[in-house]
Design a protein with these regions (language model features):
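Short, positively charged and aromatic/hydrophobic N-terminal segments
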Residues: 15, 21-24
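Expand to "…catalyze enediolate/carbanion chemistry for C-C bond making/breaking, isomerization
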Residues: 24-334
Length: 334
């Protein structure tokens, strides 16, 4: 958990954290919040301090631009980065199919609090919380955003993404993910951070991630249990195209929705791996058409080309085709 949170006016984060248990219990009795389908194949991290990178980000074909105020900004440059980001958002051209999110600093230091104030000026699609270790890390910021008047006509204002990059975060995965299932919880996505996790645990960085695979799958399962999206960690060697493609394929097979990226050259590989091939789209259309046929009305199981297909496969096919629609819409608006 983040340490003691500094006092700031409107709203008081310390007070919000203190009443967290009561708020959490109240939320669990509310109606689950609906998380609409979004494209998150490629999440490119852009240092908020880098003016050239900020300008270039608008021209790139990534689904999500993550403006980073944390690891990629030196402590003495934090204030400058916040000011640059607020100025960038003031002229940002937003369009359907792309999200703009901001990763803040931890709230156990002064920069995290100041970052949240900047969030109110920027109003991104989401706030990315680093090193989330327990549910209260999410709930405190969710309450702060509501109390600060961050709700707007885009449903309920900025959502939250939780970075799972600590041993404690892994141990508390289910409780963290559960905060996203209810009204006001704001949590929309889990993001794996392996660099910090490897540093804390000592797990070896080996190609294929054999010792990390069980932990990665835990994050996927927790996200799916509570209707959240889930994004795989960065691939550090952006010069290794084959290694990136292999890790993107692995992530897709594990069930991730997309991948964190650190360089524009990684975008195409992520979009391809987490996209939909023509063969996949054709198969999905065949499944949907089979269940829509009059002779199959009311059936829970049908046969397609000698293969038994259940209704759950039709649901999966429908979601895949909805993803195709989103991809095509993005192409039309960019």
């Amino acid at each position: 958990m983040w340490g003691p949170i500094l006092f700031i006016a409107r709203p008081n984060l310390w007070a919000l954290a203190a009443c967290g248990k009561a708020r959490h219990k109240e939320r669990m009795n509310r109606t689950p919040h609906h998380h609409p389908l979004r494209l998150r194949r490629s999440v490119l991290s852009v240092p908020a301090i880098n003016a050239k990178a900020l300008a270039k980000s608008a021209t790139l074909d990534c689904d999500v631009v993550l403006f980073d105020l944390e690891d990629s900004v030196l402590p003495e440059k934090k204030a400058e980065a916040r000011a640059a980001l607020v100025a960038h958002f003031a002229t940002l051209d937003r369009y359907p199919g792309r999200e703009h999110v901001i990763r803040i600093n931890p709230l156990d230091g002064p920069d995290g609090v100041l970052d949240l104030k900047a969030v109110l000026d920027c109003m991104p699609d989401a706030v990315v919380l680093p090193k989330v270790s327990e549910p209260q890390d999410v709930l405190t910021v969710a309450d702060w955003l509501s109390e600060a008047g961050a709700d707007d006509d885009r449903d309920f204002g900025p959502r939250l993404w939780a970075m799972i990059e600590t041993a404690a975060g892994l141990l508390n995965l289910a409780a963290i993910a559960e905060t996203g299932r209810t009204e006001g919880g704001r949590l929309d996505c889990l993001v794996v951070g392996l660099n910090d996790l490897r540093k804390e645990t000592g797990i070896a960085d080996i190609p294929g991630r054999p010792y990390l695979a069980p932990l990665l799958l835990q994050v996927v399962v927790a996200a799916r249990a509570f209707g959240l999206d889930v994004v795989d960690a960065v691939f550090n060697n952006f010069a290794d195209a084959e290694g990136l493609e292999a890790e993107c394929r692995q992530g897709r097979q594990m069930g991730f929705d997309g991948k964190m990226l650190i360089h524009p050259t990684q975008i195409d590989a992520a979009n391809a791996a987490y996209g939909v091939t023509e063969a996949e789209a054709a198969e999905a259309l065949a499944v949907v058409a089979a269940f829509a046929a009059p002779e199959n009305a009311g059936k829970a199981v049908v046969t397609i080309a000698g293969r038994m297909v259940e209704k759950l496969h039709a649901d999966q096919a429908g979601r895949l085709l909805a993803k195709v629609d989103l991809i095509n819409e993005r192409k039309r608006t960019t």
